[in-house]
Amino acid sequence: ITWVTGVQTCALPICSLAFSGSLLCLIWGLIEANRIGWDTSLTTLRLLAGVLLMVLFVVVQRLQLRPMVDLQLFKHPRFVGALLGMFAYAGCAQVMMTLLPFYLQNGLGFTAIASGLGMLPFALTMLTFPKIGTRLSRLLSPASMMALGLTLVGCGNLLSAWAVSMGGYLSFACAIAVTGAGAGLLNGDTQKNIMACVPRDRAGMASGMSTTMRFSAIMLAIGVFGALLASHSQQALTRSLQLNAPGWLAQTDHIVSRVVAGDMVAAMQPLTENARLIVQPLAQQAFVSGFSTVLWVAGLMALLGALLVGTLMRNPIPAVQLSAA
């Protein structure tokens, strides 16, 4: 690290460690909070460490002559809207490619291969709708395109939540096709809109911020949605076991941890044959209840993102102003 007149000119290792450490502590705290409790000192310490490391990252960036991230960009609503669009797309659409197969396995009893095939409606619309988006972009503004894509994602997730609560594959397939359509519309536009907000000589920084936002959103979404799924599934299973099989309440944590991971067989191993006949349907119902909650939250977040992004991105592009500066 080099210091010149009290100003840090090269702090890439510190910035990288601070940002990575912040994400690590936040995700760690979110995931473990459901196991050890949200009111424990360890959970508070992890989340607080994540916030402090993020503050350190911002402070170090502001002290540099040539910062890795130009924080002045965040003064422009359109740039903030473009980043929020990427965050919402990754956190509410892309992450579903990881989470939805768990429902096919645990909720509908599909094999791993059948679950992969069951995701085809999502994949097909995600692959075909970028071409439709190219044509729509001639008629709609970037703000409208982003809002439309996120609205489709939100509606698809809400329809998926309804389909999960109803049961059956056909309605679920139609719902995830809507989510895939929204993801397809957003796939090319998200990074393009971010790049359009910065001068050409800062294109590398914009590309890095776009990629960082994408993967940060995916990691945080998996942590948050995973914690939400585990928490609601555990609550639902505890209530069911208290009514139907109180003798197996001690196995609740083990059963939920394995079911949420997609391994129903391992979840049932500690139980006797007779107990499995009672507990397995209860575990399946608890998982479905928790998964439906996750989809409701993801759907509402995507719709909120559509509103915010559609509003913020109607502001003028700041690239010309930044170039002049």
What are these regions (language model features)?
Residues 32-37:
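Short, hydrophobic transmembrane alpha-helix segments
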Residues 13-19, 27-28, 39-49, 53, ...:
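Transmembrane core module of solute transporters
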Residues 66-72, 237-241, 317-325:
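Short, Lys/Arg-enriched, Gly/Pro-containing loop segments at transmembrane-helix junctions
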Residues 23, 98, 130, 218-223:
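Glycine/proline-centered helix-kink
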Residues 214-311, 324-325:
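Hydrophobic transmembrane architecture of multi-pass small-molecule transporters
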Residues 1-10:
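Single conserved hydrophobic/aromatic residue that forms the stacking wall/gate
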Residues 17-22, 46-52, 295-309:
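Symmetry-related core transmembrane helices of the 12-TM Major Facilitator Superfamily/SLC fold
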Residues 85, 209-213:
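Hydrophobic alpha-helical segments of secondary membrane carriers
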